[in-house]
Amino acid sequence: MMSYALLAFIMLNGILALCLRKKESENNVSGNDAIQDNRIEQLTLVSRLLLYPATFFLGAGIFLGAVWANVSWGRYWAWDPKEVWALITFLVYGVAFHSQSLRIFRKPLFFHIYMILAFLTVLMTYFGVNYVLGGMHSYANA
């Protein structure tokens, strides 16, 4: 849950950055552009710093869940939809770690849009799998 909270905060930072960008484009005041860009850069920095513990906690949750599954069912991984979507979420956020090697992630606007869209995987993992898809972690048929 800690990872989901941090990822939600990153997503909210992205929405705020997009709102600031929209406000900047509507006003077009030259002196105000530098202030807005500075705020967007600060939001980007905060989001990038929060991405590390968020992804760590997400990975730790997947790892501990696998250990618990081995104790309970005798296997670490069963390719259950919840497990698969947790892995997809982990990989999607893992891509954002490569901001130095992937030039497109250096642009704050792209980074924030990516973080907003990446949060859809969190929503699918948390709600979609539980209430829509089947599997061990599903409440859709209950």
What are these regions (language model features)?
Residues 24-37:
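Juxtamembrane inter-helical linkers in multi-pass membrane proteins
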Residues 1-24, 42-72, 81-142:
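Hydrophobic cores of alpha-helical transmembrane segments in multi-pass integral membrane proteins
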